[in-house]
């Protein structure tokens, strides 16, 4: 890609200027994903780089092996890593990305950190988990490691285990399944459908279930820009009984049923179920 090559040559010139002015600090550049073409171009046209930063999500654990296979010999780090991104997952028939459960996301955090710790070449400087807090991005629960109330999600437990080798004294609950009792992801507005979840807690703490229907987000931005939270429809959920509830499909459109499970000890977990009112 001639344009990309011109960019890397220009960045090389800038790096030389920076090093001439400040030789005591390394020069680092961050790219999105461990893309083979980008890495080869950097190796050929940007020799002054000292540290390569990579932002990666679903495939973050493969960044180190990819660099090694291409002959990369300089330090690198994961400048951002987290759960599979909303652009990396399957979608429903109406285009809604399928969000992994908080527990499935935690497994991705753990596997990524293990890959960094197992880096045989000794070139990995570490990584930054995204993100310590909560954020509306595609959904209110996709990327945050904490709930708005401060409760930790399973991803916090996962990074603690990877860093220390030990699980926290109190671990977050787990949602094993969430779905309509009779598969009805698409149904007429106004119809009522039963939903059931299966959840558990490692310490057998009593669990509290919170159900909420929200519209599918329409304010989708790029690059992490702030998004408006979609409208919620609390009246759409009736007859909640712990891990079970009934949902009245709202007026025509795309929605999600969110489930938050709390253990009363500062831990929580989340999952959601997309559905479409016809």
PLM-predicted stretches and their roles:
Residues 267-273:
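Extracellular and select intracellular beta-sandwich modules with Ser/Thr-enriched
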Residues 1-55, 60-61, 66-73:
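Active-site neighborhood of glycoside hydrolase catalytic domains
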Residues 215-246:
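Surface-exposed, flexible coil segments in extracellular/virion-facing regions
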Residues 274-278:
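Short beta-strand edge segments in extracellular beta-sheet folds
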Residues 253-257:
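Exposed beta-strand face motif in extracellular beta-rich ectodomains
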Residues 68-223, 271:
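Substrate-binding clefts and catalytic carboxylate motifs of secreted carbohydrate-active enzymes
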Residues 247-251:
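Residue-level recognition of secondary-structure-to-loop junctions
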